[in-house]
UniProtKB/Swiss-Prot annotation:
UniProt lineage: Eukaryota, Fungi, Dikarya, Ascomycota, Saccharomycotina
PROSITE patterns: DEAD_ATP_HELICASE, HELICASE_ATP_BIND_1, HELICASE_CTER
GO molecular function: ATP binding; ATP hydrolysis activity; RNA binding; RNA helicase activity
Annotated protein name in UniProt: ATP-dependent RNA helicase DBP6
Subunit relationships: Associated with pre-ribosomal particles. Interacts with DBP9 and RSA3. Together with NOP8, URB1, URB2 and RSA3, forms an RNA-independent complex, which is required during early maturation of nascent 60S ribosomal subunits.
Length: 629
């Protein structure tokens, strides 16, 4: 009924009855360096099966077998025999283990390695017979069919989501959409923005406009369900704002009565102003009303304004939106579009619980409470892949727009990146090396430079900006800073020690600075890595490395915007930061390009060292005087 168990003691039986004509030879000694789990299990089973036999006889058989297999000495065998004289169900396993350990102690590691290599060489020679393996072509993977990093979502909810891919070749003239767009809207686009689309604009307009126009002509009530919700992962500076603004203005172009039909939620006040400027240019010559709500304005005044004149489009931050919902300044009864820009940042922060509050009002304010009553458009350069965070938005038939790549994030197409590797011994001179690096790429650039430098903290921003100012004041004494002597250099810092008005003025001056030959430097933290649309930043420098690939994408995305050239420089100190940066690269798509090393001569003369030391002393005195004041 049951299969008989395996008895290792019977393994010697076939050897006794060898076929005739074959001369019996003693098998070569084999040293088992690593016991296999299956072997010990079989031996354990065998010891259980022979439990009714005397333990002494089994020990003697096992001892004889070990002497043949392993060539053990009499001294080792006697030790094992004494140990196995005690009856035990695991005597076989224990004796083999002790025998193996004793043999390994007597054999050197080099002998064991050489024996393994010799065996491997003999096996290879016997098996290959000087035959070479036929070369095989490299396996070609289709990115369209890959479950890549960007598609390795944290929930199976993404598996049934419609995915729409695009690439950098998808550029069209806006005139191709003459039959889909209102004539006045098309005129405003070509006049104020561009005559050609960006790839993300092309794919969204191709996917939405035909269905949108057809559905509006049939039934304005249910057009939101025909479109469904939209999620877009696109690089910074790729034209996302215009991509979602055009369908909104096209839909509301012929509206008769002003009602709140679109809410655009952004994370910062600076981004509010940029989106407002874009929509104002798009709606020129129309009766559409575009309003903003932000913390700088009086909440009471905004409440009065929104109650008296209901806008068609409202641009706000999540916290301010909650304030107006609580005060009943706005009603979502007629809402058709909900836009969430920089979605990953908004969804990672609660902002007074804005998301549950907004979804609750959509259920109570709207007469149509069925799913899909509002088109939700989610945009980000680093769109979250965590469906748990997106679940709170109650998405309806979402379409996910992705660049055709096997990476998690994509960088601007015209971005050039360089790594400046600083030896650990020279890290104390890092600010001086920063200025020297600027001298190097300014020597090959006849145009004015507008440089944005990212540091890790507010304190670092204040300290570095003042130190660079002190060094530049005495740059004539330095040999490495000779290229800066004839250039106007302006260095400022955006930090929390400044008032809001001061920071706003500094950013405005940096944005509108247009020296024909000079350097404008703005030092900041990651607060300016998002929502700053300054198209003529020539260089971004990561003085301190970012904490993640997501943060890196937003930093370097401040340059090479709107299909313009831009450069990013990474100052990496020692092997640790270089290794960390290599890990970041695994998530980034550069469209076939790579990060280039920038070789610099870090030899400093005595005059340079003295200049740096005196600047540090001046910085110390400055901070002491500031603290006393």
């Amino acid at each position: 009924m049951f299969a008989s168990r395996f008895d290792p003691s019977q393994l010697t039986a076939p050897a006794a009855s060898a076929p005739e004509g074959i001369v019996g030879t003693t098998p070569p000694a084999i040293v088992p360096l690593k016991r296999q789990a299956t072997e010990s299990d079989n031996e354990e089973y065998g010891s259980h099966q022979d439990s009714d036999e005397s333990s002494n006889s089994s020990s003697e058989e096992d001892e004889d077998r070990m002497q043949v297999d392993y060539g053990a000495s009499e001294e080792d065998s006697s030790e094992v025999e004494e140990e196995e004289s005690k009856p035990s169900t695991h005597s076989t396993v224990l004796s083999r283990f002790k025998q193996t350990v004793s043999l390994q102690e007597r054999l050197g590691a080099s002998d064991i390695a050489e024996s393994k290599e010799d065996e491997g060489i003999e096996d290879e020679a016997a098996s290959t017979h000087q035959l070479k393996q036929i070369p095989q072509p490299e396996f070609v993977k289709n990115p369209m069919n890959l479950n890549t990093n960007s598609l390795q979502f944290k929930s199976t909810g993404w598996l049934n989501t419609e995915k729409i891919y695009y690439d950098n070749s998808l550029i069209k003239p806006f005139s191709d959409y003459a039959n889909e767009l209102e004539a006045k809207l098309l005129q405003n686009i070509c006049k104020n923005f561009s005559t050609n689309t960006f790839p993300i604009q092309s794919i969204i307009l191709d996917s939405i406009l035909p269905v949108l126009n057809f559905t509006l002509n049939v039934s304005k009530r249910n057009f939101t369900r025909r479109i469904g919700d939209i999620l877009v992962n696109a690089a910074t500076g790729s034209g996302k704002t215009l991509a979602y603004s055009i369908p909104i203005v096209q839909t509301l172009f012929k509206r008769q009565i002003n009602r709140l039909r679109c809410i655009i939620i952004v994370p910062t006040k600076l981004l509010i102003n940029q989106v407002y400027t874009t929509l104002t240019k798009l709606t020129q010559g129309t009766s559409l009303i575009v309003s903003i709500a932000k913390l700088e304005n009086s909440l009471k005044d905004e409440h009065k304004k929104l109650s008296n004149l209901e806008p068609d489009i409202l641009i706000t931050t999540p916290g301010r939106l909650v304030d107006h919902l609580n005060m009943k300044s706005i009603n979502l009864k007629n809402l058709k579009f909900l836009i969430i820009d920089e979605a990953d940042r908004l969804l990672n922060q609660s902002f007074q619980g804005w998301c549950p509050k907004l979804m609750s009002h959509l259920k109570t304010d709207k007469l149509d409470t069925l799913p899909g009553n509002v088109i939700k458009m989610i945009f980000s350069a680093t769109l979250t892949t965590n469906t748990e965070k997106l679940n709170g938005l109650n998405l309806y038939k979402p379409k996910l727009f992705l660049k055709q790549t096997d990476k998690l994030y994509q960088l601007p197409n015209k971005l050039n990146e360089f790594n400046i590797n600083i030896p650990t011994a020279k890290s104390v001179y890092k600010p001086l090396i920063l200025l020297y690096s600027i001298c190097q790429f300014m020597a090959h650039s006849p145009i004015a430079a507008k440089i944005l430098i990212f540091v890790k903290s507010n304190e670092s921003s204040i300290r570095l900006s003042k130190l660079l100012q002190l060094i530049c004041e005495s740059r004539s004494q330095s040999s490495v800073l000779k290229n800066l002597q004839n250039l106007a250099v302006s260095i400022n810092s955006v930090n929390s020690n400044n008032s809001k008005a001061e920071n706003k003025k500094i950013v405005a001056n940096f944005s509108h600075h247009s020296e024909s030959a000079g350097i404008t430097i703005l030092i900041t933290t990651d607060i300016m890595s998002r929502g700053i649309d300054i198209n003529d930043i020539t260089q971004v420098i990561n003085y301190d490395p970012p904490m993640s690939s997501q943060q890196y994408v937003h930093r370097v995305g401040r340059t090479a915007r709107a299909n313009e050239l831009g450069s990013a420089y990474n100052l990496l100190v020692g092997r640790g930061e270089r290794t960390f940066f290599d890990d970041l690269n695994k998530d980034l798509d550069r469209d076939g390009k790579s990060v280039q090393p920038l070789e610099l001569d870090f030899t400093l003369l005595e005059s340079d060292s003295e200049l740096y030391t005196s600047s540090l002393e001046s910085l110390k005195n400055y901070h002491n005087n500031t603290a006393q004041a």
